[in-house]
């Protein structure tokens, strides 16, 4: 067996990775880590801040001396014996064992975690639980003031007779033990040695035992000095000075990777996990990254075997290609894994295995082996599957039976197809494809947009589901259904939640870890409220579902575009799209409706207006015909917001009801199709970024039925509305002026009017929303291509 080795140190130090901020947390400045403090188990003189007659500084000094003495007098083996004698975990690094043992001997044994009954442990900043809440998640409970057992520490014989025994016995009496006070201001760099270089306030170049090197930008610009190279060779992180100032400001060491200064100078490349990069830098990497695995038959690009016409090995109906995900917030894990058997011409068979973190290839565990025979290759593949998942391979592949195990990977069930980030048109292909397209030019340009990689890359990047190592836009319906079931189950649990405090937080944490294992994200976080569930779970799942369907419709356009792939995809839509004449009455009516009901989208202090680029009429076989819809009662022409990445699915399958019911806009009416009489509301969905000003708004004819229910607040239960399929109108803070409304052709109402304040100023809705529960009562009629433009912008034409 020939082995090609590549990189690679396994990158996980058990529970030692730095905490990072998610995109959501950075964007909204939600620094809301919740720390819960059980009833204090210490005696404190509140007047002078002393515990048991000793000041906090005295306790710190005494503990430092105690640690120095035990380090000198106790061996690591003796410390393990002490931990085992007190029924505590004796595994881990030397530092973890020592810190765990010294905390036990000096301050006393900790009580079990109040959430999961696991063991609590000091991590240098706070006490965190090391137990598991479920097979999907570690317990994430932490506190600065944990309760301790009111009992003496058990000392093994080897320690009883040691020179340090008298010192240890001094702290045996629980009533006389010092109390650790972590509520006071903590020095952010406790336990770290920091070296400085360059034009900083201080210079210190002794690297012995250094945790990191803080260097000036000038050192980076010079391409790396010998001193800087020395630090890199020793594996010492080199960071910008901002790391120091930010850590001091936030009173906690910030993740070193986010302040990296020079790792891109190393031979292996930058190697910073995406979830530890600044969101702006991560976005740039994401958009320029090449998808490495496009689906169940895709050969992982890092193998280079696709260049030799390599194919995924198939036997007895099984494709030997698996992808996995694991997100564990308690252990700071967010990993993917890929394993494949690849056949190249002349029957050469290779086993490929890779496990790591997105963006950190230099630290990934990776192997590519040429196999001597098929049977041995299959045995090794099956062994690896069972090792990383704890499940049998064939039970998964043939029956999709799988039981998640703690800290084990879960399969991402890839579908047999080509994900759009690979199969759709790249930037260089777009012009050629449109030139060769036989469709009407405006329609060809429209299809060019919907068949481009760009809109799908942006959508996945903005949702945080943009891993280049996993084809999240080419998963099976079964996988999507599992995600939906877990989401609905969690929402039901939260709505009837009786637990409070840490136990309620644990339920949210468990769901978050489960969710981001099933839906691998480059920026996982712990959900805290319904709005985050709506934005980052429900809407994201709907988006991934729509992108998956787009992947199947588009197929693989990565080859020649001479065969007119745009026309081929257009035919698959089962939909007729025709440009609307700009001098027609319908065109003028739609422009008027847009201008009357639009309010500028605000981004920071800048407002964006909108202009109409073109309008298309739509005849979709997935929607009721015009002849059928006009026979229905209470017909209204309404605006629907949609991302460009969702449009292929809408045109091919029609609108689908929302995936769940949540007490937030867009989901508060349950599993309904939601529209608005305000173009402003639809525009908020269609507008994604200032550097991508083009978008589409949908105009649909909706029949609200004979009975319309008006609601001023979210209904407690949407089940009856969903069952009766009645039309619902949610009353917003703003409405369109009813005196300006008019009736269009065939008794279709157009609520076109200036936006004015309503009498419902306490409504959770900004504008009126209309909910329809039966897709057969909604007909997509027009697509309005718009361009968002900065208001009052002055273009400088001076040279």
Swiss-Prot record:
Involved in the base excision repair (BER) pathway, by catalyzing the poly(ADP-ribosyl)ation of a limited number of acceptor proteins involved in chromatin architecture and in DNA metabolism. This modification follows DNA damages and appears as an obligatory step in a detection/signaling pathway leading to the reparation of DNA strand breaks. CDD domains: parp_like (cd01437), WGR_PARP1_like (cd08001). It catalyses: L-aspartyl-[protein] + NAD(+) = 4-O-(ADP-D-ribosyl)-L-aspartyl-[protein] + nicotinamide; L-glutamyl-[protein] + NAD(+) = 5-O-(ADP-D-ribosyl)-L-glutamyl-[protein] + nicotinamide. It holds the Pfam family PARP_reg. This is Protein ADP-ribosyltransferase PARP3. It is found in: Nucleus. GO terms for molecular function: DNA binding; NAD+ poly-ADP-ribosyltransferase activity; NAD+-protein-aspartate ADP-ribosyltransferase activity; NAD+-protein-glutamate ADP-ribosyltransferase activity; nucleotidyltransferase activity; zinc ion binding. Keywords: ADP-ribosylation, DNA-binding, Glycosyltransferase, Metal-binding, NAD, Nucleotidyltransferase, Nucleus, Transferase, Zinc, Zinc-finger. Its EC number is 2.4.2.-. It comes from Medicago truncatula (Barrel medic). SUPFAM superfamilies: ADP-ribosylation (SSF56399), BRCT domain (SSF52113), Domain of poly(ADP-ribose) polymerase (SSF47587), WGR domain-like (SSF142921). Residues 564-795 form the PARP catalytic domain. Residues 189-261 form the BRCT domain. InterPro entries: ARTD/PARP, BRCT_dom, BRCT_dom_sf, PADR1_C_dom_sf, PARP1-like_PADR1_N, PARP1-like_PADR1_Zn_ribbon, Poly(ADP-ribose)pol_cat_dom, Poly(ADP-ribose)pol_reg_dom. Residues 436-555 form the PARP alpha-helical domain. Residues 108-152 are annotated as: Zinc ribbon. Belongs to the ARTD/PARP family. Residues 309-409 form the WGR domain. Residues 1-55, 140-161 are annotated as: Disordered. PANTHER family: DNA LIGASE, PROTEIN ADP-RIBOSYLTRANSFERASE PARP3. Residues 71-105 form the SAP domain. Zn(2+) binds at residues 113, 116, 129, 139. One of its GO terms (cellular component) is nucleus. Residues 1-49, 145-154 have a biased composition (Basic and acidic residues).
């Amino acid at each position: 067996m020939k082995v090609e080795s590549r990189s690679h140190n396994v990158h996980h130090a058990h529970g030692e990775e730095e905490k990072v901020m998610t995109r959501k947390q950075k964007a909204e400045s939600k620094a809301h880590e919740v720390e819960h403090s059980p009833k204090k188990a210490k005696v404190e003189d509140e007047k002078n801040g002393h515990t048991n007659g000793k000041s906090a500084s005295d306790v710190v000094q005494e503990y430092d001396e105690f640690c120095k003495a035990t380090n000198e007098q106790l061996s690591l083996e003796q410390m393990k014996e002490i931990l085992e004698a007190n029924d505590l975990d004796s595994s881990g690094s030397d530092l973890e064992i020592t810190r765990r043992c010294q905390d036990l001997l000096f301050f006393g044994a900790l009580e079990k975690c109040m959430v999961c009954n696991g063991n609590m442990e000091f991590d240098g900043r706070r006490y965190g639980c090391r137990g598991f809440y479920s097979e999907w998640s570690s317990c994430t409970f932490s506190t600065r003031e944990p309760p301790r057992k009111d009992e003496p520490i058990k000392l093994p014989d080897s320690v009883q007779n040691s020179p340090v025994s008298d010192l240890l016995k001094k702290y045996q009496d629980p009533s006389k033990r010092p109390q650790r006070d972590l509520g006071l201001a903590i020095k952010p760099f406790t336990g770290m040695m920091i070296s400085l270089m360059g034009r900083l306030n201080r210079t210190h170049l002794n690297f012995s035992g250094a945790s990191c090197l803080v260097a000036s930008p000038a050192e980076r610009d010079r391409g790396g000095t010998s001193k800087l190279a020395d630090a890199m060779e020793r594996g010492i992180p080199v960071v910008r000075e901002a790391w120091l100032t930010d850590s001091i400001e936030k009173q906690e060491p910030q993740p070193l990777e986010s302040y990296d200064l020079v790792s891109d100078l190393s031979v292996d490349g930058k190697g910073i996990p995406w979830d530890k990069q600044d969101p702006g830098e991560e976005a740039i990497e994401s958009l320029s990254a090449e998808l490495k695995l496009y689906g169940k038959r895709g050969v992982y690009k890092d193998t280079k075997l696709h260049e030799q016409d390599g194919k995924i090995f198939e036997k007895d109906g099984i494709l030997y290609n698996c992808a996995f995900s694991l997100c564990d917030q308690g252990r700071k894990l967010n990993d993917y894994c890929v394993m494949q058997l690849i056949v190249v011409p002349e029957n050469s068979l290779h086993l490929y295995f890779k496990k790591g973190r997105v963006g950190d290839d230099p630290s990934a565990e990776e192997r590519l082996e040429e196999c001597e025979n098929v049977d041995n290759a299959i045995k090794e593949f099956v062994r690896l599957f069972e090792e990383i998942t704890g499940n049998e391979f064939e039970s998964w592949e043939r029956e999709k039976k799988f039981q998640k195990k703690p800290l084990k990977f879960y399969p991402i069930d890839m579908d047999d197809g080509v994900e759009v980030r690979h199969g759709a048109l790249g930037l260089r292909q777009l012009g050629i494809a449109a030139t060769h397209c036989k469709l009407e030019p405006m329609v060809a340009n429209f299809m060019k947009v919907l068949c481009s990689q760009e809109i799908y890359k942006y959508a996945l990047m903005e949702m945080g589901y943009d891993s280049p190592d996993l084809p999240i836009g080419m998963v099976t319906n079964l996988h999507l259904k599992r995600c939906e079931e877990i989401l609905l189950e969690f929402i039901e649990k939260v709505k009837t939640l009786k637990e409070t405090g840490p136990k309620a937080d644990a339920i949210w944490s468990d769901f978050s870890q489960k969710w981001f294992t099933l839906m691998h994200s480059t920026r996982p976080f712990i959900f805290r409220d319904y709005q985050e569930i709506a934005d980052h779970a429900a809407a994201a799942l709907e988006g991934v579902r729509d992108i998956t369907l787009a992947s199947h419709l588009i197929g693989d356009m990565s080859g020649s575009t001479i065969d007119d792939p745009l026309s081929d995809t257009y035919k698959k839509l089962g939909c007729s799209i025709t440009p609307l004449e700009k001098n027609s009455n319908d065109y003028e009516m739609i422009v008027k409706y847009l201008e009357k009901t639009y309010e500028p989208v605000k981004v920071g202090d800048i407002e964006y207006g909108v202009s109409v680029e073109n309008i298309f009429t739509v005849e979709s076989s997935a929607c009721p015909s015009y002849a059928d819809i006009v026979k229905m009662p209470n017909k209204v022409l309404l605006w629907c917001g949609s991302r460009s990445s969702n449009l292929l699915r809408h045109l091919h399958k029609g609108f689908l009801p929302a995936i769940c019911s949540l007490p937030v806009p867009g989901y508060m009416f349950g599993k309904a199709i939601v529209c608005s009489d305000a173009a402003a509301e639809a525009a908020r969905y269609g507008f994604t970024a200032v550097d991508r000003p083009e978008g589409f708004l949908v105009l649909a004819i909706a029949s609200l039925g004979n009975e319309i229910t008006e609601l001023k607040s979210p209904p407690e239960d949407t089940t009856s509305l969903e069952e009766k399929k009645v039309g619902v109108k949610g009353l917003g803070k703003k409405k369109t002026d009813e005196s300006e409304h008019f009736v269009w052709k065939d008794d279709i109402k157009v609520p076109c009017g200036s936006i004015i304040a309503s009498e419902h100023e306490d409504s959770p809705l900004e504008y009126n929303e209309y909910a329809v529960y039966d897709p057969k009562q909604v007909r997509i009629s027009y697509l309005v291509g718009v361009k968002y433009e900065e208001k009052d912008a002055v273009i400088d034409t001076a040279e």
